[in-house]
Curated annotation (Swiss-Prot):
Cross-link named Glycyl lysine isopeptide (Lys-Gly) (interchain with G-Cter in ubiquitin), sites: K68
One matching Pfam family: EnY2
PANTHER family documented for this protein: ENHANCER OF YELLOW 2 TRANSCRIPTION FACTOR
Coiled-coil zones: none
Keyword Transport: yes
Source organism (scientific name): Saccharomyces cerevisiae (strain RM11-1a)
GO annotation, biological process: chromatin organization; mRNA export from nucleus; protein transport; transcription elongation by RNA polymerase II
Molecular function as annotated in GO: transcription coactivator activity
Entry keywords, A to Z: Activator, Chromatin regulator, Cytoplasm, Isopeptide bond, mRNA transport, Nucleus, Protein transport, Transcription, Transcription regulation, Translocation, Transport, Ubl conjugation
Family, similarity comment: Belongs to the ENY2 family.
Gene: SUS1
UniProt name for this protein: Transcription and mRNA export factor SUS1
Length: 96
């Protein structure tokens, strides 16, 4: 019996929320992004994009800003959060 990817993802997300780990990881990420000034940089980037392209809508702005915002996440923050996620997954996934 195999589980498809969507089912597995759904179960992991559910367990992540129920165990409280989602909130812990999310809070850590938010704190690090605020501390690094990432939030302000993304706000500035968004404002700039809106001024340059006054006729664009939310979807267009998001498609422009999101890739740049993701690139602006520091390596240390990315590594820390991914480590937390890996540790969580190792705790629930049977690798044998």
């Amino acid at each position: 019996m195999t589980m498809d990817t969507a089912q597995l993802k759904s179960q992991i997300q559910q367990y992540l929320v129920e165990s409280g780990n989602y909130e812990l990881i999310s809070n850590e990420l938010k704190a690090r992004l605020l501390q690094e000034g990432w939030v302000d940089k993304v706000k500035d980037l968004t404002k700039s994009e809106m001024n340059i392209n006054e006729s664009t809508n939310f979807t267009q702005i998001l498609s422009t800003v999101e890739p740049k915002a993701l690139e602006m996440v520091s390596d240390s923050t990315r590594e820390t959060v991914l480590k937390q996620i890996r540790e969580f997954l190792e705790g629930i996934v049977d690798t044998q």
